[in-house]
Amino acid sequence: MKPENKIPVLTRLSDEMTAVVNFQQPGLPPWPADGDIETQRQYYLLERRFWNADAPSMTTRTCAVPTPYGDVTTRLYSPQPTSQAILYYLHGGGFILGNLDTHDRIMRLLARYTGCTVIGIDYSLSPQARYPQAIEETVAVCSYFSQHADEYSLNVEKIGFAGDSAGAMLALASALWLRDKHIRCGNVIAILLWYGLYGLQDSVSRRLFGGAWDGLTREDLDMYEKAYLRNEDDRESPWYCLFNNDLTRDVPPCFIASAEFDPLIDDSRLLHQTLQAHQQPCEYKMYPGTLHAFLHYSRMMTIADDALQDGARFFMARMKTPR
């Protein structure tokens, strides 16, 4: 699609989102478009420092968890001494960027709003690690904490998964992997998904939206996919194209959030409509005037904080509902 035919989203954003787009951090250099992947990872970490400031204070603990691929770093956020549930968080970043620090504020806010222990998983990034390594690392982390619950004062009977963008795909894929492989790590009471991609190769929203402002042009999306997958056959895997999985049964309750001007919004719409058609518990909410990745900007956007609180409320409601 010619760029001229796309929706001019920058003229339609909310005032809050526009303020974020126009905000310039003092002393921040330009994005290293021609830099190698490690340079881009370091820039992303630097750029996110401002957005992670002034986060709630709470007890945190870092733990290296053994997996078949080696140790994976996790960070436990404990807002209170005892927890009624665990929420595992998978960060976004197109499978190639991000870590526990780039999403620290998001995890702290989720821990505060749910009152539960949030465990961030620093899964191995692509292209150094290819599908399905990040999923298998996540499953290994869940298995580890289910076996060492007393050591960490965890309640592993009720667990959930959460993630943004690529992390949302990993969150849902990991829950389906546990179901499909009959791996018991606790009762998955909910999955919180913010503006994820779930397997569509093309869509109306991918044609109408996406540009330099969000890093989600068609070329960008192709690059992320090629970095993550081993080969073209993986495109149809039921833990990458989640619409090729069985979404008609035993899908944990899903909170599905989308951004109005996100090229990935049709992934969320299709996921919601599929689950709803098959009586799988789910809730869908679109946040008007927003771009992909708006969850990061709660320092300037009340709607970002609203989206986190909406997900937290969904999770807490499922904590009280026998399943």
From Swiss-Prot:
Compartment annotation: Cytoplasm
Keyword field: Cytoplasm, Hydrolase, Serine esterase
EC number(s) given by UniProt: 3.1.1.-
Protein name: Acetyl esterase
The gene coding this protein: aes
Principal location: cytoplasm
Family (UniProt): Belongs to the 'GDXG' lipolytic enzyme family.
CC per GO annotation: cytoplasm
PANTHER family: AB HYDROLASE SUPERFAMILY PROTEIN C4A8.06C, ALPHA_BETA HYDROLASE FOLD-3 DOMAIN-CONTAINING PROTEIN-RELATED
A GO term for molecular function: carboxylic ester hydrolase activity
Motif Involved in the stabilization of the negatively charged intermediate by the formation of the oxyanion hole boundaries: 91-93
Database matches in HAMAP family: Acetyl_esterase
